[in-house]
Amino acid sequence: MDMNLILSSIGVFLVVILLLVVILLVAKKFLVPSGNVKLTINGETGLEVESGSTLLNTLAVNGVFLSSACGGKGSCGQCKCQVLEGGGEILPSEVPHFSRKQQQDHWRLGCQVKVKSDMAIKIDESVLGVKEWECEVISNKNVATFIKEFIVALPKGEHMDFIPGSYAQIKIPKFSMDYDKDIDKSLIGEEYLPAWEKFGLLGLKCKNEEETIRAYSMANYPAEGDRIMLTVRIATPPFKPKEQGPGFMDVMPGIASSYIFTLKPGDKVIMSGPYGDFHPIFDSNKEMMWIGGGAGMAPLRAQIMHLTKTLHTTDRKMSYFYGDRALNEVFYLEDFLQIEKDFPNFTFHLALDRPDPAADAAGVKYTPGFVHNVIYETYLKNHEAPEDIEYYMCGPGPMSKAVEKMLDDLGVPAQNLMFDNFGG
C-alpha cells in the first residue's frame, strides 16, 4: 500500500478530530452556562454563585444544606424548595414528587434544577440552621447482631441545636473494602461475631465509585452533649433461594452501612444536620404512643429520653411498644425499664416474634408476636378512644405498613400518626 496514502489518511483523520474538538469547545462556551449569577434566598439573602451546577450542590458550596438522603440522584424527593424565578420548567423526573398544586406553587427538587441564570428561591427557615462538620468517631460498637451504635463528636466549640426526632446526613466517600479485612471484629463483639461467621458476612466486599450522602435518624437527645449518635443496620444482600444453596445473592451490600461498619474510634467523617420534621407535639396533652422495631429505635429513643429526662413530663400518658426477633437483639432495654420505674405515666412493652427461652430465663417481661398484633391485643382492643392517641413510629417497612393498617381499621385519623419510615 502507498505510504503517502496512509499518511494522508491519518492526516485527514487528525484534522477531522481537531475540528470536532473545536466545535465542542465553541458549543460549550455558548451553550453551557458559565460565570457568576445572583441567588436570592427567601427574598433577603443574596449570594453571588457560580453557574452550571445543580441548585443542591450550589447551595451546599455556599453553606446551605438541603436534605438529600439519596445523594442528589432525584429518588428520595427530600431536597424540595420553591424556585420562584430562574428555574425553568419542571422536569419529568420531578413531577412524581409533587401534586399539581405544588407544581403551580413552583416546588422543585434542588438536585434536578440547574443554576443557569439569576434565581430566586424559598426554603424552610430551619434549613438555614443546618451545619456541616468534620467529626471524630468516638465509638462504633455492635448493640445487636447487625446493628451498630455509631457515635461521633462535633469539633471542639461547635454545637447543634435540634429537636429530638431529627436526622443527620453522612458523606460517603469513594472506597473499596473487604468485610473480613476492613471491619474491626472486636467492635462487632464476641456475642455477635459467631452469627456473622455463620451467615458468611465476612466474605462480603463492597465498592463505592462516587461520593454520595446518606441520612440516618439521630438516637441522641440534646442533653447528651455535642455529639451525634446513630443506630445503623448493615444492609446485606438478599439470601439466595433455597434451591440455589446457602449464601447471599451476587449483589453488593449497602454502600453507606458498609462504610460506617469499617469506621473506628479516631476516624474522621463529614456530617451535617439537623434535618427533618419528625418531632413530638410538645404543646399537647394527648396520650402518646411510640412504636418501633430494629434500628428504628433511634429517633424514638431521642424523643422519649428528652420528654422524660429533660422535660420531666408527668402529665401525659406515654407508652412505647418495641418489636424485635429475640431478646439478644434488643438494645437500650435497661434505659426504658428504668424510665418505667421513674415515671408512673410511662410504660414499656416488648414484643418478640416468638417465645424466647433466654428472655424467660432472664425474667424479662415480653409478649410473643408481631408488634402490631401485640399493640392491638394487649392495649388498643379495649382502649376507649384509640383515635385520640398521638402515634410516633419508626421501623422496617413491613412493620410500618401493618401498624398503619391496624390504626386505620381503628379509625385513627392520618394526622395522628407521625412516622419516620426508613423502609427496611
Tell where the protein language model's regions lie, with residue ranges.
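Fe-S ferredoxin-like electron-transfer domains
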Residues: 19-26, 30, 96-153, 158
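Ferredoxin-reductase
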Residues: 138-265, 324-325, 351-355
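Cysteine-centered iron-sulfur cluster-binding motifs in ferredoxin-type domains/subunits
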Residues: 68-77, 110-114
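Short coil-to-beta-strand transition motifs
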Residues: 126-135, 207-214, 330
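Reductase modules of NAD(P)H-dependent flavoproteins
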Residues: 2-72, 83-104, 309, 314-424
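A short, basic/flexible loop-to-alpha-helix module at the beginning of a structural domain
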Residues: 259, 272-286, 381
